[in-house]
Structure formats: structure tokens, C-alpha cells
């Protein structure tokens, strides 16, 4: 069991992007924080906060030690995008500090919003993140073969064109794909494609794609 901290580390899910999707519970913890830890994008949402700010980039493991140290006499809130339980920094913190020293505040994930936008349920979906990960396309293909719904977090390296080419190479051209860009933001865009046409689409940044096997669900 981890040593008990004076102040619990608060891990807050900030939602898919827009402040209007952040819960009131999350906002209150952030308002009361002495220290905010998060990515530059998330910290920029709270420029008016008087809390001391620590930027999270590739310094994950080193920063955990700092967070634990700061929690001895300060209220530390760690900001994560979406929901803390969905491909986030939360697991590293909980594993290191112990759940007895943490409070995890859920948020709305980009995947939840993506499924809401296309009017589909997500309780029967398979989820995968390619964000910042390499060599995972074979695993993606396996999951697409095994599941009728697969939601994927993409990035510039693992982009939709690359995924479309891989699906075609593997004989999976009959899938329907929704590309969900800038979810909750002003430039939000939801588009539907077949695999062949998706090869011609240029999509940048972090996005959610939902791959559907419509034939199996009929």
C-alpha cells in the first residue's frame, strides 16, 4: 500500500474539448486547485486561474514524483482530456500513488460524443488508440474482423488514409467509416465514407473514427 498523502491527487476529466462539456464537479475542483498539471492545450483553458501550472509533455514518469511531492501541502489537480479512464495519464498516477491517494473525476470522452453525434450505441463497441503508438495496425485489423463497431483514436502518423489503405489491403472494403473531427469545437465535422473513398481524404490532428460492419449487424 502506498504511503498516505496529506492531500489527495485530483485527476479531472476535462471532456472532449469545449468547456461547455466539462462537468460542474470537475470545474469546482479546478477552481479550488493550488496546482494544475496538464498539456499546454488543457492549461490554456485556465489562463485566468491563479494556480501554479506544470506542463505535461513527455515527462510523464518524472512529473508523477513531483505531483506526489506537491500533494504534501497543496491541492494538486491533474487535467486529462476526455475521461480519465479512457487512454489517459490517470493510470500511471493511480498505479504510482495508489487509488487511496487519488480522486478520479470522470468526464465526457471524445468517443462518447462521437457515438452520440452519429446516433449509435457504444456499449457493444471495441475501442483502440493509435495516438502516439506505432506498429498497431495489425492489431486494429484483427479487431475490425472480430467486432461490428470499432472506435479508433487517430493522430497525424496513424491517419485515416493509412488506415483506409490497410483495410483495403486486408480485404475489408465493405466497412462504413465515420470520421469525427474537432469534436465539441467550432470546426467540428462529422463525415461518412466507404473505405475506398476514405483513401482520398486529408484529415489532420487528433480525431475519432468509427468503423462499422453494417452487413454483420443486419
Segments and roles (model prediction):
Residues 85-147, 200, 204:
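Class I SAM-dependent methyltransferase SAM-binding "motif I" and its flanking Rossmann-like core
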Residues 1-105, 112-113:
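Class I S-adenosyl-L-methionine
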Amino acid at each position: 500500500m502506498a504511503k498516505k498523502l496529506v492531500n489527495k491527487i485530483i485527476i479531472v476529466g476535462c471532456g472532449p474539448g469545449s468547456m461547455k462539456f466539462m462537468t460542474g464537479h470537475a470545474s469546482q475542483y479546478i477552481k479550488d486547485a493550488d496546482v494544475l498539471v496538464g498539456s499546454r492545450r488543457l492549461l490554456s483553458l485556465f489562463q485566468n486561474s491563479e494556480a501554479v501550472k506544470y506542463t505535461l509533455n513527455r515527462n510523464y514518469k518524472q512529473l508523477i514524483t513531483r505531483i506526489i511531492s506537491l500533494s504534501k501541502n497543496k491541492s494538486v489537480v491533474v487535467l486529462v482530456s476526455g475521461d480519465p479512464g479512457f487512454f489517459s495519464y490517470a493510470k500511471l498516477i493511480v498505479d504510482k500513488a495508489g487509488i487511496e491517494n487519488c480522486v478520479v473525476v470522470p468526464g465526457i470522452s471524445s468517443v462518447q460524443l462521437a457515438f452520440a453525434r452519429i446516433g449509435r450505441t457504444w456499449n457493444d463497441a471495441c475501442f483502440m488508440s493509435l495516438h502516439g503508438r506505432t506498429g498497431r495496425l495489425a492489431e486494429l485489423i484483427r479487431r475490425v474482423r472480430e467486432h461490428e463497431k470499432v472506435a479508433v483514436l487517430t493522430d497525424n502518423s496513424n491517419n485515416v488514409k493509412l488506415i483506409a489503405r490497410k483495410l483495403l489491403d486486408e480485404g475489408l472494403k465493405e466497412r462504413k467509416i465515420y470520421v469525427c473531427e474537432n469534436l465539441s469545437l467550432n470546426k467540428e465535422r462529422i463525415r461518412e465514407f466507404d473505405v475506398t473513398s476514405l483513401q482520398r481524404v486529408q484529415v489532420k490532428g487528433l480525431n475519432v473514427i468509427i468503423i462499422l460492419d453494417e452487413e454483420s449487424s443486419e
